[in-house]
């Protein structure tokens, strides 16, 4: 009887170890080189030789089509009917950051570690707490200080009766710094925490760069690998306490 229990426990430990390793391997694969299940994303990333202007850094491997990249540069485009000029004309210095933000969101295949499922009519997945390099966030905030807005969360709460977003009743237009007093407030609050201000700098391999030189390769590939491996490893190592407990029971039975 003791021998049978020993064999059963041994098989259980081996099975749990195999399952943990399998989950880690599967998770690592699904977190890398993937596209979100969202409104305009391709099903799988691939080359797009004619990506437009600010979206062109992703042309060798992209989740967006050429048409999507062109629309990302337009005011009130068909993508989301979003009006950047809802409180007067947004400065070109500020708008380029929102265009780049749109290109990153639509085109990047390196956001897998931060993709979350959502129950929304226009998308099934979103990104959450993507660690944005501190310089990119700071520059975005600095370049938008002379532009105006009427809300701190641009994901919801707009008046869409005209077919595009307008300020809701009672919302007043103020400089960006009124609604976003810090760079962290801008990057983290504007899209419902899609981004999180990172303490890491560009080139560290630990934060996502909104801007990069494609001639030097895409630095976000390394960043995605780092976080995917960290997440997968956490899942695997999380099973060790239970495995150790079972092993102790096994040793007790054998003795």
UniProtKB/Swiss-Prot annotation:
Among the GO biological process terms of this entry, one is: regulation of transforming growth factor beta receptor signaling pathway
Tissue occurrence: Detected in kidney proximal tubules (at protein level).
This protein's GO CC annotations: apical plasma membrane; basolateral plasma membrane; brush border membrane; clathrin-coated vesicle; endosome; external side of plasma membrane; extracellular region; membrane
Identify the residues that bind folate: 101, 105, 122-126, 155-160, 194
According to the record, glycans are attached at 67, 159, 199
Q: Where in the cell is it found?
A: Cell membrane; Apical cell membrane; Basolateral cell membrane; Secreted
Q: Which GO terms describe its molecular function?
A: folic acid binding; folic acid receptor activity; signaling receptor activity
| Signal peptide annotation | 1-24
User: Upon deletion of the gene, what happens?
Assistant: Embryonic lethality at about 10.5 dpc, due to gross developmental defects, including defects of neural tube closure, craniofacial defects and defects in heart development. Embryos can be rescued by maternal folate supplementation.
Q: Which Pfam families match?
A: Folate_rec (PF03024)
Q: Which residues form the propeptide?
A: 233-255
> Which cysteine-cysteine pairs are annotated as disulfide bonds in the entry?
35-63, 55-103, 64-107, 87-173, 94-144, 133-207, 137-187, 150-167
Instruction: Please outline how this chain is modified post-translation.
Output: The secreted form is derived from the membrane-bound form either by cleavage of the GPI anchor, or/and by proteolysis catalyzed by a metalloprotease.
Q: Which terms are listed as keywords in the entry?
A: Cell membrane, Cytoplasmic vesicle, Disulfide bond, Endosome, Folate-binding, Glycoprotein, GPI-anchor, Lipoprotein, Membrane, Receptor, Secreted, Signal, Transport
At which residues does the record annotate a lipid attachment of kind GPI-anchor amidated serine?
Answer: 232
Name the predominant localization: membrane
Q: How does it sit in the membrane?
A: Lipid-anchor; GPI-anchor; GPI-like-anchor
Q: What does this protein do?
A: Binds to folate and reduced folic acid derivatives and mediates delivery of 5-methyltetrahydrofolate and folate analogs into the interior of cells. Has high affinity for folate and folic acid analogs at neutral pH. Exposure to slightly acidic pH after receptor endocytosis triggers a conformation change that strongly reduces its affinity for folates and mediates their release. Required for normal embryonic development and normal cell proliferation. Required for renal folate reabsorption.
Q: What name does the UniProt record give this protein?
A: Folate receptor alpha
Q: Which organism is it from?
A: Mus musculus
Which gene specifies this protein's sequence? Folr1
């Amino acid at each position: 009887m003791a021998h049978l229990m020993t064999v059963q426990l041994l098989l259980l430990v081996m099975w749990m170890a195999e399952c943990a390793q399998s989950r880690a391997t599967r998770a690592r694969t699904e977190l890398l080189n993937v596209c979100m299940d969202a409104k305009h994303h391709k099903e799988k990333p691939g080359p797009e030789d004619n990506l437009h202007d600010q979206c062109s850094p992703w042309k060798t491997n992209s989740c967006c089509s050429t048409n999507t990249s062109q629309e990302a540069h337009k005011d009130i485009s068909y993508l989301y009917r979003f009006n950047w000029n809802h409180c007067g004309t947004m400065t070109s210095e500020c708008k380029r950051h929102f265009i780049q933000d749109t290109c990153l969101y639509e085109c990047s295949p390196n956001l897998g570690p931060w993709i979350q499922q959502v129950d929304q009519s226009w998308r099934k997945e979103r990104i959450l707490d993507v660690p944005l390099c501190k310089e990119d966030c700071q520059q975005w905030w600095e370049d938008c200080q002379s532009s105006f807005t009427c809300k701190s969360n641009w994901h919801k709460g707009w008046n869409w009766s005209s077919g595009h977003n307008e300020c809701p009743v009672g919302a007043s237009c103020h400089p960006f710094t009124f609604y976003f007093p810090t760079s962290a407030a801008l990057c983290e609050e504007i899209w419902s925490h899609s981004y999180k201000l990172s303490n890491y700098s560009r080139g560290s391999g630990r934060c996502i760069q909104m801007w990069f030189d494609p001639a030097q390769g895409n630095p976000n590939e390394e960043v995605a690998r780092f976080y995917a491996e960290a997440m997968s490893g956490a899942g695997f190592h999380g099973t060790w306490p239970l495995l150790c407990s079972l092993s102790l029971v096994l040793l007790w039975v054998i003795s």
